[in-house]
């Protein structure tokens, strides 16, 4: 069997489909290296027909780095590093915005691996957008304005208290998460630690304000940036099939899960790979 992976770009800026890998078995070092560099280059990659268990998903994710355990979402049985995103009428989707995962911590995730376990008959697509392409499309004066600015990211923006009052145990878990994750600052423009490329690093899910400018200026800048980053030309859209896998670079992308499938059910498993502290370095 050939060790060579087939990598087909899905657009000029972001996204590729990969075939020739069996993720139910450990990848060879050669194949993992190809996969790793494909994620760096294309920012999100997709593989079909990968019926992996939570344990196998964890093992694959651990080859990319140390894993994050989410403070609120439920975990797969016996595998704390795999969160279960089970959405249906009694538990509707709660992240109906474009976001980068877990930017409310000092070292936001470097990436994530998402596995489709149960899908609606139609709908439930996920879209990703490229912060690199969005940054490179800006004029030079506007890039200069943004470079060096810092923005606040707040856990509570996507996890407000009212959503976690069903039980006292749930509310207590939320309070503990808030105490452990106070608002913090990240650069508005982030330098990728491996490629050196610059990317916009603000997202509607967690970014609350730009601290180096006035309140009105912050509102205007964030309103523009949220709209600009999510322009269709910077996006790729994936129509899920059972046992599909998506792997993305969380440092330079945002994503949006379409909530158009209720009352049907959608179950996804996610492993989240820890990253490093965001920084900006002039190119």
From Swiss-Prot:
Pathway entry: Organosulfur degradation; taurine degradation via aerobic pathway; aminoacetaldehyde and sulfite from taurine: step 1/1
SUPFAM superfamilies for this protein: Clavaminate synthase-like
Annotated TM spans: none
Residues modified as 3-hydroxytryptophan: 128, 240, 248
Subunit structure as annotated in this protein's UniProt entry: Homodimer. Was later shown to be a homotetramer arranged as a dimer of two dimers.
Cofactor binding notes: Binds 1 Fe(2+) ion per subunit.
Gene behind the chain: tauD
Keyword NADP: no
Lineage: Bacteria, Pseudomonadati, Pseudomonadota, Gammaproteobacteria, Enterobacterales
Consequences of knocking out this gene: Disruption of this gene leads to a loss of the ability to utilize taurine as a source of sulfur, but does not affect the utilization of a range of other aliphatic sulfonates as sulfur sources.
Name the record gives this protein: Alpha-ketoglutarate-dependent taurine dioxygenase
Catalysed reaction, written as an equation: taurine + 2-oxoglutarate + O2 = aminoacetaldehyde + sulfite + succinate + CO2 + H(+)
Induction: Is only expressed during growth in the absence of sulfate or cysteine.
Positions contributing to taurine binding: 70, 73, 95, 102, 270
């Amino acid at each position: 069997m050939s060790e060579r992976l087939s990598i087909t770009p899905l657009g000029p800026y972001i996204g590729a489909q990969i075939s020739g890998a069996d993720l139910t078995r450990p990848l060879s070092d050669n194949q993992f290296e190809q996969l790793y560099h494909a994620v760096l280059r294309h920012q999100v990659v997709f593989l079909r027909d990968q019926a992996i268990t939570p344990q196998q998903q964890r093992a694959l994710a651990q080859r990319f780095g140390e894993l994050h355990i989410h403070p609120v979402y439920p975990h797969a049985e016996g595998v704390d590093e795999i969160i279960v995103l089970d959405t249906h009428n009694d538990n509707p989707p709660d992240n109906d915005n474009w976001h980068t995962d877990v930017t409310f911590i000092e070292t936001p995730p470097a990436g994530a691996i998402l596995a489709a376990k149960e899908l609606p008959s139609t709908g439930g697509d996920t879209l990703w957008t490229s912060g690199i392409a969005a940054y490179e499309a800006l004029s030079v004066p506007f890039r200069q304005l943004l470079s060096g600015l810092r923005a606040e990211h707040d856990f509570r923006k996507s996890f407000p208290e009212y959503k976690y009052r069903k039980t006292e145990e749930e509310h207590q878990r939320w309070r503990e998460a808030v105490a452990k994750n106070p608002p913090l600052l990240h650069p508005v423009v982030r330098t990728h630690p491996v490629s050196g490329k610059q990317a916009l690093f603000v997202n509607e899910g967690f970014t609350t304000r730009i601290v180096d400018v006035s309140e009105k200026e912050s509102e205007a800048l964030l309103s523009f940036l949220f709209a600009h980053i999510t322009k269709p030309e910077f996006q790729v859209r994936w129509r899920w099939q059972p046992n599909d896998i998506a792997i993305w670079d969380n440092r330079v992308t945002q994503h949006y899960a379409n909530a158009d499938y209720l009352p049907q059910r959608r179950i996804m498993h996610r492993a989240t790979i820890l990253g490093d502290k965001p920084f900006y370095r002039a190119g």
